[in-house]
Design a protein with these regions (language model features):
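Active-site rim beta-loop-alpha module in soluble metabolic enzymes
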Residues: 188-196, 200-247
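C-terminal accessory domains and tails appended to enzymatic cores
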Residues: 100, 238-320
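Short catalytic helix/loop segments, enriched in acidic residues and glycine
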Residues: 67-87
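Boundary at the C-terminal end of the N-terminal hydrophobic targeting segment
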Residues: 19-23
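Active-site glycine-rich loop that binds ribose-phosphate moieties when present
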Residues: 166-192, 201-204
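Bacterial N-terminal signal peptides
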Residues: 7-16
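A glycine-rich helix N-cap at a beta->alpha junction
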Residues: 119-137
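Mature N-terminal segment immediately following signal peptide/propeptide cleavage
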Residues: 41-64
């Protein structure tokens, strides 16, 4: 997914982040789950599910032609994306979900066809938003589902493999670990004590996510043959797989553990172009590591997310 340019408000938000008083060893840090967050519901009949919906991992998607407003197949594939979300919602309801919030987490954040979604869900749309692809998550949720996800920029396989921006980002590391969108977003959920329970996408994305965050349910809807090629299920078959894996995930929801990163979090962000790195280095608490990499230390994943929102809001069109 790609972020639109939205520096102004978020830069001022970033300036409000205070530098840590003393450097800490990550191994000695504390859990990112904060006591100030709202308590999760203990009601036996309440089951809240958060869905983060990306597009590159949707059935049949292989190139730009399907994933952006300029693509000749985009309108059709918006329909497939929406249908995958609906398949997940349907199965989640059948398995006992009482509340569902969806974050449209691809491109301009306005991909899902709202008129085709059921009227008993809520939807987060468009940018900017400080928690990015996870906007709306909090400790009241019981589980998170990633739909239409893809492999990371560090993975040599996977359809449309990238991390946050295929146009600008070459690496994202937290405390020395290479991160994918799935792992960053899982850490966002883990901050609030909420586990990821299922992921859908190509075989590479599903396997990568399971290696990083654990044995979550995986709905494989296509098999990567290259960056722009795949062997894919047909839409109706993909919806069946998503329904099946969603039901399985909710049936074993108590088995999953939140993916929690200990603080402080040292983010190293490597970009393709030198100019955004230079500009980011002007901000407080940001260190330029080399011509293409900056380092930022955040006290929790929310601070990291705010910084990423600023950094990835840079427009590639402004490159020299």
């Amino acid at each position: 997914m790609r972020f639109r340019m939205f520096y102004c408000g978020l830069v001022f938000s970033l300036l409000a982040i205070e530098a840590p008083a003393q450097e800490q060893n990550p191994a000695e840090g504390q859990s990112t789950v904060q006591e100030s967050t709202p308590p999760r519901s203990d009601a036996a009949d309440s089951l809240k599910i958060f869905i983060s919906a990306d597009m590159e991992g949707v059935v049949g998607v292989v190139s730009d032609a399907q994933i952006g407003p300029g693509g000749f197949e985009y309108e059709r594939f918006r329909g497939f994306m929406t249908a995958e979300v609906n398949a997940c919602i349907e199965a989640a309801r059948e398995a006992g979900a009482t509340e569902i919030l969806i974050a449209d987490a691809h491109g301009n954040g306005q991909n899902l066809l709202v008129e085709r979604l059921p009227d008993d869900v809520m939807l987060v749309r468009s940018w900017p938003r400080p928690m990015g692809m996870m906007e709306g998550i909090d400790s009241s949720f019981d589980g998170v589902i990633f739909l239409g996800y893809h492999a990371s920029t560090a993975n040599e396989r996977g359809v449309r493999a990238h991390t946050f921006s295929s146009a600008n980002v070459t690496a994202v590391r937290l405390n020395g670990m290479s991160m994918s969108e799935a792992s960053v977003n899982a850490a966002m959920a883990g901050h609030f004590g909420v586990p990821v329970i299922m992921v859908s996408g190509d075989n590479v994305a599903v396997a990568e996510t399971q290696v990083i965050i654990g044995d979550v349910e995986g709905a494989v809807v296509k098999w990567a043959k290259g960056f722009h090629s795949a062997q894919t299920l047909m839409p109706e078959a993909a919806y069946r797989v998503i329904r099946d894996r969603t039901r399985a995930a909710i049936e074993r929801i108590d088995e999953f553990e939140p993916y929690v990163l200990e603080s402080p979090l040292r983010l190293e962000l490597s970009l393709k172009h030198y100019r955004p790195v230079e500009l980011l280095s002007y901000l407080p608490n940001v260190e330029r590591v080399n011509s293409h990499t900056v380092r930022f230390v955040g006290q929790d994943i929310l601070e990291i997310s705010r910084f990423l929102s600023v950094a990835l809001g840079y427009s590639v069109d402004l490159q020299p």
